[in-house]
């Protein structure tokens, strides 16, 4: 699921070992309510027509931000066009409609029925026929049998899951032996999520969570994925003004190549392979 508010970290982020007890039912209801409200704001003919195509309309910085995530995920997955792809946490289709340009078979799921309904309407409006949108819980993909997909991708979703580990185990269950995972994590070492957002008065999402790269690797490995690798990307926020976007793109190109700098990027992308063992 993709949303605007993020966690404001005045204290170090909770690690797997430090997690406080969570009422998972309450947390999921809160998330569903949030997205139901967001979907209601967009559920109109003007939004369906906006952008002149299936892609969800957003500002240039947001489109660049999403493009970079998807481009990186495609490179890390290294999957052919005929691969069966599952996207978990698709929201209204922000990344989904980019994936449909690459893959012949995309299934996209989200916890929010309202988000899925909106994504379906957008796909129908723009005649995107190679995607199936379904309501599903990332931590319990009960509608899918084992080994259903060649690739599982998830963007801006694990950060909101009560148990990212449980979700990643489900991702592995529905991936075929040899299947690939690519998921993203907001980087706890990025200044944007703490002092910068505080200075801008941006309200945190109550259930958001940040991850250091080592923690993301450990969680993915702990869920049974092998050959786990991470990559730091993006210093550009979706909120960057149009006039500054060119400068921030340059910052990304340079910063992502410098080891001492890239560790402070906004996003940690993680990939893994399902070795088929149970």
What label would you give each PLM region?
Residues 165-177:
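A short glycine-rich, Lys/Arg-flanked "PGG" loop and its adjoining helix->strand segment in the class I
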Residues 92-140:
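Class I SAM-dependent methyltransferase SAM/SAH-binding core
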Residues 182, 195-200, 218, 228-278:
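A C-terminal cap/extension of S-adenosyl-L-methionine-dependent methyltransferases
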Residues 187-207:
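Short, glycine-/aromatic-enriched active-site segment of Class I SAM-dependent methyltransferases
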Residues 5-8, 13-79, 252:
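Conserved class I S-adenosyl-L-methionine
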Residues 208-223:
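Short alpha-helix
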Residues 179-185:
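Conserved beta-strand signature within the Rossmann-like core of class I S-adenosyl-L-methionine
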Residues 139-151:
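A short acidic, Gly/Pro-enriched loop at the edge of an enzyme's catalytic core
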């Amino acid at each position: 699921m993709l949303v605007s508010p993020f966690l404001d970290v005045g204290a170090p982020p909770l690690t797997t070992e430090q997690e406080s007890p969570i009422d998972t039912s309450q947390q999921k209801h809160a998330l569903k309510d949030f997205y139901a409200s967001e979907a209601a704001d967009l559920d109109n003919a003007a939004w369906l027509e906006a952008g002149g195509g299936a892609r969800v309309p957003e500002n240039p910085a947001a489109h660049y931000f999403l493009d970079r995530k998807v481009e990186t995920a495609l490179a890390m997955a290294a999957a052919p066009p005929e691969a069966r792809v599952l996207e978990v946490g698709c929201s209204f289709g922000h990344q989904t409609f980019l994936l449909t340009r690459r893959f012949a078979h995309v299934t996209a799921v989200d916890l929010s029925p309202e988000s899925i309904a909106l994504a379906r309407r957008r796909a129908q409006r723009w005649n995107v026929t190679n995607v199936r949108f379904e309501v599903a819980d990332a931590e319990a993909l009960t509608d899918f049998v084992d080994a259903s997909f060649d690739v599982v991708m998830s963007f801006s979703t694990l950060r909101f899951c009560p148990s990212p580990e449980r979700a990643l185990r489900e991702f592995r269950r529905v991936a075929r032996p040899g299947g690939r995972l690519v998921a993203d994590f907001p980087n706890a070492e990025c200044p944007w999520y703490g002092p910068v957002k505080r200075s801008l008065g941006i309200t945190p999402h109550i259930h958001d969570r940040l991850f250091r790269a080592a923690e993301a690797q450990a969680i993915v490995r702990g869920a049974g994925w092998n050959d786990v690798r991470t990559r730091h990307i993006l210093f550009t926020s979706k909120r960057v003004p149009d006039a500054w976007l060119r400068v921030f793109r340059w910052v990304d190109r340079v910063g992502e190549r410098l080891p001492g700098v890239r560790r402070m990027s906004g996003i940690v992308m993680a990939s893994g392979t399902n070795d088929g063992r149970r």
